[in-house]
């Protein structure tokens, strides 16, 4: 893989990690487009590190607060919200890895993501702010995040949808969703590093790794800041239409043996 391909995959990872359209699903499509095999695992890991950097930079005040106040309500909310994904991830890791490699369900998963995004806008706008979020809210939002273990189910999409259903206001829904992404991304990085050290990754040039990581970080930061502002006044339906179109296209190509 050359640095330009890594740069493009970094753009895909950075934008789609925080837009509600599934980063894993788009990375699968990107690897297919560039004819990369699963040996791109090490690059995937570095791309996740890039998006993690984006979150750390955007939420630097929050993370400084969490370090100084490790037993704060915010920390407990993040822990409670992360539990469902940890349980599902540990119990079914191998099963979902096999699904991710084949891509056989990706088209359907994009359609499911679109359904939830479309239905979310039918809810009346909530008024809950960060201080109003309960542990029950965090657990339910985290349970929706656990569904994103399927490769083309959007993590940010599902958590934003769940947050809106729990009556968080639109800005807070996106804000908490991205903050909750941090432990999920860290967990994904840890699991991928385990596979890397077990020899499941190919050798990739340091230039490509650096370019891909910085690209993911830069575009991830843009996506976080843009999405929080966008959701204040705009609908999620445009993302629903996009993933529906993509899902239908993928299913059509799969059924005609083109993909």
Curated annotation (Swiss-Prot):
Reaction(s) this enzyme catalyzes, per UniProt: di-trans,octa-cis-undecaprenyl diphosphate + H2O = di-trans,octa-cis-undecaprenyl phosphate + phosphate + H(+)
* Record-annotated membrane-spanning stretches: 1-21, 39-59, 71-91, 99-119, 133-153, 174-194, 208-228, 239-259
- GO BP of this protein: cell wall organization; peptidoglycan biosynthetic process; regulation of cell shape; response to antibiotic
Q: Which InterPro entries match?
A: UppP
- Bilayer disposition of the protein: Multi-pass membrane protein
Question: Does the record bear Transmembrane helix in its keywords?
Answer: yes
Gene Ontology molecular function terms on file: undecaprenyl-diphosphatase activity
Q: Which UniProt keywords apply?
A: Antibiotic resistance, Cell membrane, Cell shape, Cell wall biogenesis/degradation, Hydrolase, Membrane, Peptidoglycan synthesis, Transmembrane, Transmembrane helix
Its chief place of residence is: membrane
Q: Which GO terms describe its cellular component?
A: plasma membrane
Q: What is its EC number?
A: 3.6.1.27
Q: Where is the protein found, in the record's own terms?
A: Cell membrane
**Alphabetical list of Pfam families matching this protein:** BacA
Remaining remarks: Bacitracin is thought to be involved in the inhibition of peptidoglycan synthesis by sequestering undecaprenyl diphosphate, thereby reducing the pool of lipid carrier available.
Similarity section: Belongs to the UppP family.
The record describes the protein's role as:
Catalyzes the dephosphorylation of undecaprenyl diphosphate (UPP). Confers resistance to bacitracin.
Name the PANTHER family on file.
UNDECAPRENYL-DIPHOSPHATASE (PTHR30622:SF4)
Protein name stated in the entry? Undecaprenyl-diphosphatase 4
Q: Which organism is it from?
A: Bacillus cereus (strain ZK / E33L)
């Amino acid at each position: 893989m050359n640095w330009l391909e890594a740069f493009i995959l970094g753009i895909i990872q950075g934008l789609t990690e925080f837009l509600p359209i599934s980063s894993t699903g788009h990375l699968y499509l990107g690897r297919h487009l560039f004819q990369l095999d699963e040996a791109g695992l090490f690059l995937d890991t570095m791309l996740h590190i890039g998006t993690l950097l984006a979150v750390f930079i955007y939420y630097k005040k929050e993370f400084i607060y969490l370090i100084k106040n490790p037993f704060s309500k915010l920390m407990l909310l993040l822990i409670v919200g992360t539990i469902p994904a940890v349980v599902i991830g540990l119990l079914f890791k191998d099963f979902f890895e096999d699904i991710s490699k084949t891509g056989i369900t990706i088209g359907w998963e994009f359609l499911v993501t679109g359904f939830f995004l479309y239905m979310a806008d039918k809810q009346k706008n909530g008024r809950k702010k960060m201080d109003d979020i309960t542990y029950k809210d965090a657990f339910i939002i985290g349970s929706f995040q656990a569904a994103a273990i399927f490769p083309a189910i959007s993590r940010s999409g599902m958590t934003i949808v769940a947050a809106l259903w729990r009556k968080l206001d639109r800005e807070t829904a996106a804000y908490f969703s991205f903050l909750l992404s941090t432990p999920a991304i860290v967990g994904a990085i840890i699991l991928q590093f385990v596979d890397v050290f077990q020899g499941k990754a190919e050798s990739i040039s340091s230039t490509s790794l650096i370019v891909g990581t910085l690209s993911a970080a830069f575009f991830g930061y843009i996506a976080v800041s843009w999405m929080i502002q966008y959701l204040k006044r705009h609908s999620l339906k445009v993302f629903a239409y996009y993933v529906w179109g993509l899902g239908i296209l993928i299913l059509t190509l799969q059924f005609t043996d083109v993909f």
